[in-house]
């Protein structure tokens, strides 16, 4: 028995300590297998924020607050592509600012020019070679302040500028653009007072032997002041004067084109309704190519009285242009004449041609006081060459006026 016990003891000693530990654990687990049915306390390690009784988000913010923003950017953009893109956008933005600044520097004289315009509210700036030259020759322009030019002054201006003692000033082209509102100024502009047309009451009779007609200016106390106005004559074509009355033409370019055609074809004077026509601005002067300065132009404030008194006192005949759809109106019955009937009319009596705007024509109250009406036929309708289209149903008022003037002054 003793020998058997010794043998078991020796075998036990031969087992490794790890085996002894496993054996003890196994025996322990066997002995406590019943305890597994009871709640056991967890042996897992607590988190750091739980140990400190702190919120997880707050703990992370506090723990990593020392990490530099550069390290965060490096982690978000490890290859530097985002940084390069941001720098490129910044460079483009800076270049755009430089370009804008450079562009604005070209207009640094804008304030000077605007100040110049504000300092001279009683002046206007006539521009264009012919318009400026005609304005210098016009005695009605009694005050010329300065002649502004870019480059060189045309040779034909030198003598008249010296005679009138007009100050000349060399300016840059942009300043001329501002003063003329970007019109075609031909590098020259004249600072001068606006035209002040005479207001008249009516047209009087005329003396064909001396080729002069009388006009009656309206004075301050509504008194009529008579004046003589010479008119041009042509052999076998024009014995009596021809005037032009403009009603409700508001486009300055149309006014200028009409004045140019009237002067070229031989009209003696123009009368305008002050209240509803475009004023005689530098745009009108430029469009007329200087004819505004050469042709007598008058204003009337009472057109109906002007028509009536001119017919009674001077024997003037008023011929009104009218639209194609106006032939059925009562006041045109028996008064409509053709274009051919206008030929040589100024050999028989003094005539005032009345024209209106392109949309409505002459006002009805003026039509009712007119002696005759004339219409320009559309594209040879009578011959059947062309049918009228609603898109193009009329001529420009300046073209229509030129055709009517030419027919009146042509003797066939």
UniProtKB/Swiss-Prot annotation:
Q: Which reaction does it catalyse?
A: guanosine(2270) in 21S rRNA + S-adenosyl-L-methionine = 2'-O-methylguanosine(2270) in 21S rRNA + S-adenosyl-L-homocysteine + H(+)
Q: Which Pfam families match?
A: SpoU_methylase (PF00588), SpoU_sub_bind (PF08032)
The main enzyme category here is: transferase
Entry protein name:
rRNA methyltransferase 1, mitochondrial
Once renumbered to this chain, the transit peptide range reads 1-20
Which family would the database say this protein is a member of?
Belongs to the class IV-like SAM-binding methyltransferase superfamily. RNA methyltransferase TrmH family.
Q: What is its EC number?
A: 2.1.1.-
Note on file? Present with 2760 molecules/cell in log phase SD medium.
Whose protein is this, by species? Answer: Saccharomyces cerevisiae (strain ATCC 204508 / S288c) (Baker's yeast)
């Amino acid at each position: 028995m003793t020998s058997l016990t010794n043998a078991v003891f020796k075998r036990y000693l031969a087992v490794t300590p790890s085996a002894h530990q496993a054996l003890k654990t196994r025996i322990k687990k066997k002995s406590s297998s019943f305890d597994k049915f009871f709640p056991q306390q967890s042996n897992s390690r607590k988190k750091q924020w739980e140990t400190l009784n702190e919120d997880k988000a707050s703990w992370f913010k506090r723990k990593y607050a020392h990490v530099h923003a550069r390290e965060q950017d490096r982690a978000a953009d490890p290859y530097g592509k985002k940084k390069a893109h941001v720098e490129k956008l910044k460079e483009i933005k800076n270049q755009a600012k430089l370009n804008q600044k450079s562009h604005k520097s070209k207009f640094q004289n804008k304030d000077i020019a605007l100040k110049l315009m504000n300092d001279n509210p009683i002046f206007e700036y006539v521009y264009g070679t012919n318009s400026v030259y005609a304005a210098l020759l016009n005695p009605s322009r009694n005050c010329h302040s300065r002649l502004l030019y870019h480059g060189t002054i045309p040779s034909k201006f030198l003598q008249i500028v010296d005679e009138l003692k007009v100050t000349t000033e060399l300016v840059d082209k942009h300043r001329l653009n501002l003063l003329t509102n970007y019109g075609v100024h031909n590098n020259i502009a004249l600072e001068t007072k606006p035209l002040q047309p005479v207001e008249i009451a009516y047209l009087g009779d005329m003396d064909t032997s001396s080729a002069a007609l009388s006009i009656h200016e309206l004075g301050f106390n509504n008194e009529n002041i008579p004046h003589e106005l010479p008119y041009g004559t042509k052999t076998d074509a024009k014995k009596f004067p021809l005037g032009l009355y403009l009603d409700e033409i508001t486009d300055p370019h149309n006014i200028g084109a009409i004045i140019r055609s009237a002067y070229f074809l031989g009209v003696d004077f123009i009368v305008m309704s002050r209240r509803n026509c475009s004023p005689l601005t530098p745009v009108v002067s430029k469009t007329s190519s200087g004819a505004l300065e050469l042709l007598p132009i008058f204003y009337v404030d009472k057109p109906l009285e002007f028509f009536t008194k001119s017919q009674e006192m001077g024997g003037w005949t008023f011929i009104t242009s009218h639209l194609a759809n106006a032939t059925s109106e009562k006041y045109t019955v028996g008064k409509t004449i053709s274009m051919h009937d206008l030929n040589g009319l100024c050999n028989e009596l003094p005539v005032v041609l009345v024209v209106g705007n392109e949309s409505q024509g002459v006002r009805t109250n003026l039509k009712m006081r007119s002696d005759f009406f004339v219409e320009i036929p559309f594209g040879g309708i009578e011959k059947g060459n062309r049918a009228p289209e609603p898109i193009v149903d009329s001529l420009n008022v300046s073209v229509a006026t030129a055709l009517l003037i030419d027919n009146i002054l042509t003797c066939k």
